[in-house]
Regions:
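Generic short beta-strand segments
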Residues: 43-48, 102-106, 172-187
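Bacterial N-terminal signal peptides
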Residues: 9-18
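Beta-strand-rich ligand-recognition modules
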Residues: 24-26, 44-124, 337-371, 382-387
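Extended extracellular/luminal ectodomain segments enriched in beta-structured repeat modules
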Residues: 33-42, 94, 168, 306-313
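Short edge beta-strand/loop segments characteristic of extracellular beta-sandwich folds
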Residues: 30, 40-46, 314-320
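Domain-length functional cores that host ligand/cofactor binding and catalytic or interaction surfaces
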Residues: 135, 163-170, 176-187, 191-201, ...
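Boundary at the C-terminal end of the N-terminal hydrophobic targeting segment
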Residues: 19-23
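N-terminal "first-domain core" detector
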Residues: 118-182
């Protein structure tokens, strides 16, 4: 019996020590809501000795508790630099509430030893404030299981668009994720999307004038649009990031959860990538993850590896492609006879979709804006039309180039530099034609 007691005592001591070692409380505070509200948190924090660029020292992780219950995890991707993480604490009733923030050693990088909290500001958003409904229906995301502990494919930013139809309002939520381990190859991402982050539509939530949910549809695995039938936490729908290309499931959980505070945007005249430009740190995290994962090379290759992201020219465009037309761009440098293309001569790398979008052109290392001479846009045709029907359709193929909204290189911090003075009015390009634009 004494031996058993000694064993149990040893086990209890081991568990206690492990619990103390795996979590450390960094901050505890109270806050009071005078009415039901959505609680917001501005967490300004840093983790000395960590960097998203460095394997083994990628980031520290903080775990946040509300009223004693685990609410979310925060991966401090900004590393040793103080950064304000804008988060949601969810729905709170009127009354006093508690906030606790722990250093989660288990989910932190091996070389992460502590977290410094400079500020943890709680604000409350009640029903009288215009953005309440958009915030109250923001989805909460459980991490994709195979990313936990890998510091890869991390949700960075959530945004929403608002569409009003009579008495109904639809909030469309989209998440920007640091990378995409599955899906489109990296070289194709840069040509077709102008980025290596993953920007994924999550869910549309339609509400009536009282804020009651009328309908919710989301992006399921294989990009299937599905009706949401899962759980909600108050009005927040819960999703698991399910597939390697970051599509979602409305059932299932994982040990890590992210509850990002969304920013409202109007994309009626902008690309989705423009949201990244408004939050330029997302470009930095994108570049650091690519470098750490060995996806950057000086070699001219296709597939998973690309050049330093600062060697690309980023071109933001408004254009409509009709009847199988494809759009691509090329650039000429001063004192250089070559033209550098966005599609790398590959049909799949050309852009067939219409609207506002982004592409990139890979340039030689060390190119600066003053070395750029001319930009051209080219309209091509899908496939090899042979039948009478195919030829008839192809004959009407054209690209309606409406605007070039911005053209830039990334600076030394991997953030967008000044926009180059390249503008064009509406230009109609039948297939097989191109237009040249001087800088």
């Amino acid at each position: 019996m004494k031996a058993l007691k000694r064993i149990l005592s040893t086990v209890f001591l081991t568990i206690t020590i492990f619990a103390a070692a795996s979590a450390q409380t960094l901050l505890g505070k109270k806050f009071t809501a005078t009415a039901e509200a959505e609680a917001l948190l501005d967490l300004t924090a840093s983790s000395p000795g960590t960097s998203w660029l460095t394997a083994g020292a990628e980031a520290a992780t903080a775990t946040i508790f509300v009223d004693g219950r685990k609410h979310q995890d925060v991966i401090l991707f900004s590393g040793a630099k103080p950064f304000t993480y804008k988060l949601l604490l969810g729905h709170v009733a009127a009354g006093e509430h508690s906030l606790r923030i722990d250093f989660n050693r288990e989910q932190s990088a091996a070389k992460a030893t502590t977290i410094n909290i400079a500020d943890a500001k709680v604000t409350l958003l009640d029903r009288t404030q215009p953005e309440f409904q958009a915030v109250a229906h923001t989805p909460f995301l459980f991490a994709r299981a195979n990313t936990i502990g890998k510091f890869s494919d991390v949700p960075l930013l959530m945004y929403y668009e608002t569409v009003k139809e009579g008495a109904l309002t639809t909030y469309r939520y989209t998440v920007i994720i640091s990378n995409e381990d599955g899906g489109t190859q990296t070289a194709a991402l840069m040509a077709r999307w102008g980025r290596t982050t993953d920007i994924e539509w999550v869910v549309d939530v339609q509400v009536d004038a009282q804020g009651k949910v009328v309908n919710s549809t989301y992006q399921g695995v294989q990009h299937e649009t599905k009706t949401f039938q899962g759980k909600r936490e108050a009005d927040h729908p819960l999703f698991l990031i399910k597939s390697d290309n970051n599509n979602f499931a409305d059932d299932g959980e994982s040990p890590m959860r992210f509850t990002l505070r969304p920013v409202g945007v109007d994309l009626s005249k902008h690309s989705r990538e423009w949201v990244m430009d408004q939050h330029p740190w997302t470009h930095t995290i994108m570049a650091e993850e690519m470098t750490r994962e060995g996806k950057i090379t000086a070699e001219r290759t296709l597939g998973a590896r690309i050049a330093d992201l600062r060697t690309y020219l980023y071109v933001d465009v408004a254009s409509n492609q009709e009847n199988g037309a494809l759009l691509s761009f090329a650039l000429k440098l001063k004192n250089d006879p070559k033209w550098y293309t966005s599609d790398l001569g590959i049909g799949y790398y050309k852009i067939e979709r219409s609207g506002y979008f982004r592409t990139t052109i890979r340039l030689p290392q060390g190119v600066t804006p003053d070395k750029i001479e001319r930009l051209s846009a080219r309209c091509d045709l899908t496939g090899n039309p042979r039948s009478k029907e195919e030829i008839s359709k192809a004959s009407a193929a054209r690209c309606e180039l409406n605007a070039i909204n911005s053209v830039f290189l990334l600076d030394e911090r991997f953030q967008p530099g000044r926009t180059l003075p390249i503008r064009t009015g509406n230009v109609t390009l039948p297939f097989g034609e191109s237009v040249e634009i001087r800088v």
